[in-house]
Swiss-Prot record:
Keywords: Capsid protein, Helical capsid protein, Host nucleus, Host-virus interaction, Ribonucleoprotein, RNA-binding, Viral nucleoprotein, Viral penetration into host nucleus, Virion, Virus entry into host cell. GO terms for molecular function: RNA binding; structural molecule activity. This is Nucleoprotein. A motif (Unconventional nuclear localization signal) lies at residues 1-18. It holds the Pfam family Flu_NP. Belongs to the influenza viruses nucleoprotein family. The gene is NP. It comes from Influenza A virus (strain A/Swine/Iowa/15/1930 H1N1). GO terms for cellular component: helical viral capsid; host cell; host cell nucleus; ribonucleoprotein complex; viral nucleocapsid. Its main location: virion. Encapsidates the negative strand viral RNA, protecting it from nucleases. The encapsidated genomic RNA is termed the ribonucleoprotein (RNP) and serves as template for transcription and replication. The RNP needs to be localized in the host nucleus to start an infectious cycle, but is too large to diffuse through the nuclear pore complex. NP comprises at least 2 nuclear localization signals that are responsible for the active RNP import into the nucleus through cellular importin alpha/beta pathway. It is found in: Virion; Host nucleus. Residues 1-21 are annotated as: Disordered. One of its GO terms (biological process) is symbiont entry into host cell.
Length: 498
């Protein structure tokens, strides 16, 4: 995807590259994906996993978490300085599931972090590639976004649970770099900033001294990341105010919450990438696919292609519905937790239901769950069509708000008009327009009030047949617009607790 000015495409962020042309980007992303695949194959060999066990998504997640933990410099250093009982700072591990005599057995494994780092480097031609690590972090983040709700976290920071669609990437670790920043929703960055400001209010020394200077730099950098997600001049000007504040406090928190609310209509630019579990890349590499030579893109047809012919399994608890488990993982694979369900259903070719109606819990299995009753089934991750992932948020044009879909942050660049009750959103903006940001607040409210619900997002963009890899003939779906298509309505999901 061509990007303007100094913006790098996601792929460049993800591979840490400078500006490259499309072919170079595809090759460097391919190199990253191939590295993950080779690492996964090697780990399966080390752990003596059968082909079936290697395709089990729970095993994939354990292996991914092990390598992420092995490279977590900060935490490793902390663990060495603060030894805790029964935790070896040099080792990492997790549950590996094996199929023995027709039953699933859980085995807890422990590995030297140094050994894991060696295997990772070897798989990546001797380099310490962080790009592949970030890629796995984003896959875990997308899985969390589809699985858990963040209502509690929202309420704790003084935000409203209805802003859940702004929370993409809220569980990404701090060390996820530029690629991580690109996929964070407006609400996620607002929440990080509010937490920071609250600490500053409670702790006199937070902004002081040498440490305080670093804190201040981090604060301003986060403000700039958030500013870059907004697409109207008034929102950006308000971010400048927040960033330049001498001593950030409640006024800034108010401004940030106001901005987060405004993002429900004036949506921010949030990137979406299809990050798949490591076992999928492993399978492809094992079957002789050369990612670097073929090239790969996280935002085009490639991930759809890969899922079309990968068979991945998952453990299923006694009263879970395998089709629902498949939907959960499909959404995670395409970063579609915040997409309109009608768009997702059309692309998937199967009805995608709201989370409140899913009979499935998360993918990971807690250590105290009974393995006796566990079964496994194939995840159905195929799709009927494919579509390009977006980073724009789907406003019809930059300066005018299109009436954004409440509780939806589009993933796919597919035309849809936006059903929404402006009244419900505007109700959130009664009251405070005084203070130093009053003119900007007034301007933002004016833009939102002039937003027309009949505006169409992604005009003329459509989905493509899986045989149409060059995206030549878009099929523009028509949606029944009578019902709002949010995944989160009637929600009863578990909270995300670390």
């Amino acid at each position: 995807m061509a990007s303007q000015g100094t913006k790098r495409s996601y792929e460049q962020m993800e591979t840490g590259g400078e500006r490259q042309n499309a072919t170079e980007i595809r090759a460097s992303v391919g190199r990253m994906i191939g590295g993950i695949g080779r690492f996964y194959i090697q780990m399966c060999t080390e752990l003596k996993l059968s082909d079936y066990e290697g395709r089990l998504i729970q095993n994939s997640i354990t292996i991914e978490r092990m390598v992420l933990s092995a490279f977590d410099e900060r935490r490793n250093k902390y663990l060495e300085e603060h030894p805790s009982a029964g935790k070896d700072p040099k080792k990492t591990g997790g549950p590996i599931y094996r199929r023995i005599d027709g039953k699933w057995i859980r085995e807890l494994i422990l590995y030297d972090k140094e050994e894991i780092r060696r295997i990772w480097r070897q798989a990546n031609n001797g380099e310490d590639t962080t790009a592949g690590l970030t890629h796995m972090m984003i896959w875990h983040s997308n899985l969390n976004d589809a699985t858990y709700q963040r209502t509690r976290a929202l309420v704790r920071t003084g935000m409203d649970p209805r802003m859940c669609s702004l929370m993409q990437g809220s569980t990404l670790p701090r060390r996820s770099g530029a690629a991580g920043a690109a996929v964070k929703g407006v609400g996620t960055v607002v929440m990080e900033l509010i937490r920071m400001i609250k600490r500053g209010i409670n702790d006199r020394n937070f902004w002081r001294g040498e440490n305080g200077r670093r804190t201040r730099i981090a604060y301003e950098r986060m403000c700039n990341i958030l500013k870059g997600k907004f697409q109207t001049a008034a929102q950006r000007a308000m971010m400048d105010q927040v960033r330049e504040s001498r001593n950030p406090g409640n006024a800034e928190i108010e401004d940030l919450i106001f901005l987060a609310r405004s993002a429900l209509i004036l949506r921010g630019s949030v990137a979406h990438k299809s990050c798949l579990p490591a076992c999928v890349y492993g399978l492809a590499v094992a079957s002789g696919h050369d990612f670097e030579r073929e090239g790969y893109s996280l935002v085009g047809i490639d991930p759809f292609r890969l899922l079309q012919n990968s068979q991945v399994f998952s453990l299923i608890r006694p009263n879970e519905n395998p089709a629902h488990k498949s939907q959960l993982v499909w959404m995670a694979c395409h970063s579609a937790a915040f997409e309109d369900l009608r768009v997702s259903s059309f692309i998937r070719g199967k009805r995608v239901v709201p989370r409140g109606q899913l009979s499935t819990r998360g993918v990971q299995i807690a250590s105290n769950e009974n393995m006796e009753t566990m079964d496994s089934s194939t995840l159905e991750l195929r799709s009927r069509y494919w579509a390009i992932r977006t980073r724009s948020g789907g406003n019809t044009n930059q300066q005018r708000a299109s009436a954004g879909q409440i509780s939806v942050q589009p993933t796919f660049s597919v035309q849809r008009n936006l059903p929404f009750e402006r009244a419900t959103v505007m109700a959130a903006f009664t009251g405070n327009t005084e203070g130093r940001t009053s003119d900007m607040r007034t301007e933002i409210i004016r833009i939102m009030e002039s937003a027309r619900p009949e505006d169409v997002s992604f005009q003329g963009r459509g989905v493509f047949e899986l045989s149409d890899e060059k995206a030549t003939s878009p099929i523009v779906p028509s949606f029944d617009m009578s019902n709002e298509g949010s995944y989160f309505f009637g929600d009863n999901a578990e909270e995300y607790d670390n």
